[in-house]
Every structure is written in structure tokens, then in C-alpha cells.
Amino acid sequence: MANKTVLFNKHLESNGKMVDFHGWDMPLNYGSQIEEHHAVRQDAGMFDVSHMTVVDVIGDDACAFLRKLLANDVAKLKVPGKALYGGMLDHNGGVIDDLITYYLSDTEYRIVVNSATREKDLAWINEQVKGFSVEVTERPELAMIAVQGPNAKAKAATVFNDAQNAAIEGMKPFFGVQAGSLFIATTGYTGETGYEVIVPNDEAEALWQAFLDAGIKPCGLGARDTLRLEAGMNLYGLDMDESVNPLAANMGWTVAWEPAERDFNGRQALEKIKAEGTDKLVGLIMDAKGVIRHGMSVFFTDSDGVEQQGTITSGTFSPTLGYSIAMARVPRSIGDVAEVEMRKKRVPVKVIAPSFVRNGKQAF
């Protein structure tokens, strides 16, 4: 029996095409994935992300615990509401999950983890918390709606009350604030501005309807995937997993090496990997017709004239750019051209940093 979010009936009302997503009944689209994609790039769209897992970490040792648990350093967070992105690593340096952590106070943090990894994540967190004076509390009574796009904030402002609008006025990216019953954060998974709003289950349908009435278009998993890939954002399970270290997943910037004495999980293994060198995650763009897909092979010749091979982790047709884009894990020696094997032929591709579209515009 698939799990249903509290917004399931709202998806049916909007003719959502429901599919199984890691055990959850979620909308793939509401008629046109392309229209939903363009709505977020050009206007405003919203996503039900209530399948994500909200976990509160509270106690005297909350900071110390998260500094051990995460490769990024929550001690950098000094202003209440400030958030950071990073990986939760195993002892081999593999990525158990990528997540966002909000600093609420020195003894209170909120983390949001992926739905596909929920059970594994919670088991790992509860194992690691032993010995720390910390309470780890999952919050299944909370739903989450992401409102994204250039007009998302203005349209959402017509839904929020005066006190909520005052609380979020001028809020920088990667912040969250509790405003009335809503936790409103300037985060997202699209490369556009907007909010992720955590809302009590019993208020979620009314909030969704209010956003609909404000002219915010409902968007499904299909558009969510093309948007995040255009933005160069990783999808756990495709672009990285426990077999992949963060340095090979374009997450090196999220590893806080200083202070050197902070012994986060996986640090020793990761230091060894860093010293020896590892593969890297790159972006690919293809002018030719066709679509690059997950699992295809990438070939290039290195500066020594030796052929090297990598693998496509995520690929799609980019509705914004009008051609195929992809992310690929490849040996570090790659230059700025390569070939992808498609239908037994090799097709030339350009190699770029893995970021294609930000704020509605080409990012390279």
C-alpha cells in the first residue's frame, strides 16, 4: 500500500497523474510537464514535497552531535534561521544522504532529509546519537509545499498574513523562520527564487488551495526533475549514493575541512580519497538531436592520448535550453569535449561545470 501525502486529494482535483515514487503516491504531472517546467522558470509553480522527512534535533549536545554527523560544519551557523546544505557520510566517506540543516538556536536544529532514504537516515542518526545529550524527533504531522519561480514570492505574499510577510521580509537565501503556524524557508530545488513552506497537516489543503487561487501552478515530479537538473542539483540515488564520495559528486564545497580537529564521520576516509584524487561530476550539453539518459557511457581522450570512460548519472531534454543536458561522473583528466554512446554511435558533447540554468537564464 503506497503512502499518500495529506495533499493527495488536491492532486486528484487538479487531474494529477499519480505514480509510485519510493513508496509514495505522487503526481508525475497535471497534464503537461513542459508547461509546468516553464511556469517555474517564467512565473510561479508549486510542488507537494510532503514526502520529505522533517527531523528536529534538540538538546545541549545538538551542535556537537551535528558537527560529528555532517561533513559540513553547523558551527558556521550563527544567526537563527540560517541554513546549510551538506552530506551525511558513512565511515568510508560515502554519501548516506544530502540534506539541509536549519540553525534555530544553540540547542535546536531542524534537518530535512530525502523521502527515499528516510528509514536508512533515521536508523543511522539514531545509532550515531548514542552518547550525546540530544533528542531526535521526526515530525510526520508536518507537510511541505515548495513555491518556486520569479513571481513565486510576490504571489505567496498575497497568501501569507501580515505578520508572516513581516517575518520573511528581506530574508536572504538559505534562511528559515517560524511565522505563525508556518515554517517559511528561502530554499528550493529548481534554481529559481521562492520558498519551501512547512505547514501542519491539518492546514496543508487550505494553504495549497490558497496558493492555487493566487495563480501558482501545481507541478509534478517530472518538472521537478528537469528543473533540478537544469540547475545542476544532485538527485540522491542517481548522482550520488553510499558508493560515491562528496568530492566525486560536486559536493566538495560542502565539506568543511577546517577546523582540522573536527572529526566528522568519514573524515579519515575522505582525506585519503582527496589525497589520492577521485572522479568528478561534470555537466554535458549536446547540440545533436536525441536525449542523454542515465547509465549511458561517456568517452574522452586525455592529454596523454589515453581513452577514458565515465557514466551519465542524470540526463534529460532541457525545456529551457532546447537541447539535451546531463551530469556525468568521469575521470578528473577530462577536457572540454567528450562523446556519449547513443544507439551504438558516439555523439559529441561539450563538457561544462554542472550548472545549466539559474534564475531563468543560461548559466554557462
Swiss-Prot record:
<dbReference type="InterPro" id="IPR027266">
    <property type="entry name" value="TrmE/GcvT_dom1"/>
</dbReference>
<keyword id="KW-0808">Transferase</keyword>
<dbReference type="GO" id="GO:0005829">
    <property type="term" value="C:cytosol"/>
</dbReference>
<protein>
    <recommendedName>
        <fullName>Aminomethyltransferase</fullName>
        <ecNumber>2.1.2.10</ecNumber>
    </recommendedName>
</protein>
<dbReference type="InterPro" id="IPR022903">
    <property type="entry name" value="GCS_T_bac"/>
</dbReference>
<comment type="function">
    <text>The glycine cleavage system catalyzes the degradation of glycine.</text>
</comment>
<dbReference type="GO" id="GO:0004047">
    <property type="term" value="F:aminomethyltransferase activity"/>
</dbReference>
<comment type="subunit">
    <text>The glycine cleavage system is composed of four proteins: P, T, L and H.</text>
</comment>
<dbReference type="InterPro" id="IPR029043">
    <property type="entry name" value="GcvT/YgfZ_C"/>
</dbReference>
<comment type="similarity">
    <text>Belongs to the GcvT family.</text>
</comment>
<dbReference type="InterPro" id="IPR028896">
    <property type="entry name" value="GcvT/YgfZ/DmdA"/>
</dbReference>
<dbReference type="GO" id="GO:0005960">
    <property type="term" value="C:glycine cleavage complex"/>
</dbReference>
<dbReference type="Pfam" id="PF01571">
    <property type="entry name" value="GCV_T"/>
</dbReference>
<dbReference type="GO" id="GO:0008483">
    <property type="term" value="F:transaminase activity"/>
</dbReference>
<dbReference type="InterPro" id="IPR006223">
    <property type="entry name" value="GCS_T"/>
</dbReference>
<keyword id="KW-0032">Aminotransferase</keyword>
<dbReference type="Pfam" id="PF08669">
    <property type="entry name" value="GCV_T_C"/>
</dbReference>
<dbReference type="GO" id="GO:0019464">
    <property type="term" value="P:glycine decarboxylation via glycine cleavage system"/>
</dbReference>
<dbReference type="InterPro" id="IPR013977">
    <property type="entry name" value="GCST_C"/>
</dbReference>
<dbReference type="InterPro" id="IPR006222">
    <property type="entry name" value="GCV_T_N"/>
</dbReference>
